[in-house]
Design a protein with these regions (language model features):
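Acidic interaction surfaces
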Residues: 1-134
C-alpha cells in the first residue's frame, strides 16, 4: 500500500541493547528522517536517548519503518546510516514527487533495484521514469 506522506520515519535499535534486553532494547523514538540534515545529527539524538554508540550500541539496525514499504527489505540487515544517506541522495525526503516515484518503483521493481539506481545515478535516479496518476 502506498503511503500518503513522504515523512519517512524509522526506529533505530542496537544489537547490543537488544541482546541485553536493557532499556534501549525497543530502540529509539520514531525519527522523522526529514528532520535531520546529516547522520551526525541522528547520532546526537541517539546519544541523547542514552545510546552508547562507541560501546554496547555501536551495531545499529532498523527496528521499524513508517511511510516506506515495510516488506521492501529485511530491516535487521539494513544499516540505518546507509538507508538515511541513500534517501538523502535520492532526494525523496525533500521532494514529494520523487517520493511518489520511489514508492511506485519499489512496489514494482524492489528496494535493491532502487538502491542500485541511486548508487549509479545519484539524485537523477528517476530521470527516465514516468509516473502517471489518476
Amino acid at each position: 500500500m502506498l503511503a500518503v506522506s513522504n515523512e519517512i520515519k524509522i526506529v533505530i535499535g542496537s544489537w547490543g541493547s537488544f541482546n541485553e534486553c536493557n532499556e534501549r532494547a525497543y530502540g529509539s523514538k520514531w525519527l522523522d528522517l526529514a528532520d535531520y540534515s546529516d547522520w551526525d545529527e541522528i547520532e546526537e539524538e541517539l546519544k541523547a536517548e542514552g545510546f552508547e554508540l562507541d560501546g554496547m550500541d555501536e551495531e545499529l539496525f532498523i527496528q521499524d519503518v513508517d511511510n516506506f514499504p515495510s516488506g521492501a527489505a529485511n530491516w535487521d540487515y539494513v544499516n540505518p546510516q546507509e538507508f538515511f544517506e541513500l534517501l538523502q541522495e535520492a532526494d525523496v525526503l525533500d521532494d514529494p514527487g520523487k517520493y511518489d516515484v520511489m514508492m511506485a518503483f519499489i512496489e514494482v521493481r524492489g528496494y535493491n533495484e532502487f538502491k542500485d539506481r541511486v548508487d549509479k545515478y545519484g539524485s537523477r535516479w528517476d530521470d527516465d521514469i514516468r509516473l502517471y496518476k489518476n
